[in-house]
Amino acid sequence: MEEVEKMLHKGVSRRSFLKKTGVGLGVAAGALMFGTGIAGAQTQGGVVPESPLPYVELDPEEARLRAHAAYFRSGCAYATFYAIVSMLRDKVGGPYNQIPLRMLGYGRGGAASWGPLCGTLNGVGAAINLVAPDADVNKVLGDLIGWYTITPFPSKESNDVAVANGYKYDTKAPISVALAQSTSNSPLCHASVASWIKESGFSASAPERAEHCGRLCGDVAYKAVMMLNAWKAGTFTATFKVSDETAGCLSCHGDQQVGKMSCTSCHDAH
């Protein structure tokens, strides 16, 4: 893992990375190929199975720290995916060593900075999908998305780590103050960022906004690991329920749309 970390920081060429990690050049065309009847990634150790990969209990606080630092390397989706998969590399190894951590880099800013689904949810969704069967992915990720929409970010815990200069993996100069909190009422990147900008008074280009998103990455990675640990232990129970307001909207408009988002985050109530 240490060697991989060094290469990620140095930005080595793809060919050099493949050579040093032992991944065959044939894998470069598609590190993981999905779909019925299509073989998984070819590696020196064989074929990476399409069935869920092994999961072991992880440290959620370590996930917070890794995700925060990784955000400043390649964005939010990368950060939360990296936090979980890098720890599984450390504790499980095997197939996780053949999954390129940069594959979620496209998800920054909701996907190429277009602002749809928050990249933090995209990243943890990909990680959850690696370890859980489809039915459980929907349960765990669905509950996580619901939690995201109603939770003030950054959390007090993330702010406290910053004030204590506890983000030990960061390579940038720290912002060691508590930041304003906001609740998005939406899983969308642009809604989340806009609500925080309105609450904090900072602009989208301010270092504090980037720090907000870094702490948000930590919060979401932390929560995802907590939920995955409970899922692994057989104790996970989904708790999120749509609001009465949203349920009322869906009672009339449920056949006219797909989703569980708060309707009034985009539409006027009527």
Which stretches of residues belong to each language-model region?
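N-terminal secretory signal peptides
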Residues: 1-13
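N-terminal export leaders
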Residues: 13-34
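C-terminal segment of N-terminal export signals and the immediately downstream linker at the start
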Residues: 34-65
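A short glycine/serine-rich beta->alpha loop
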Residues: 65-74, 106-115, 204-209
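Small-residue-enriched, tightly packed secondary-structure blocks
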Residues: 75-133
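Amphipathic alpha-helical interface segments
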Residues: 83-87, 128, 141-228, 236-240, ...
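Beta-strand segments within the central parallel beta-sheet cores of soluble alpha/beta enzyme folds
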Residues: 97-106, 138-149
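The canonical Cys-X-X-Cys-His
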Residues: 247-255, 260-270
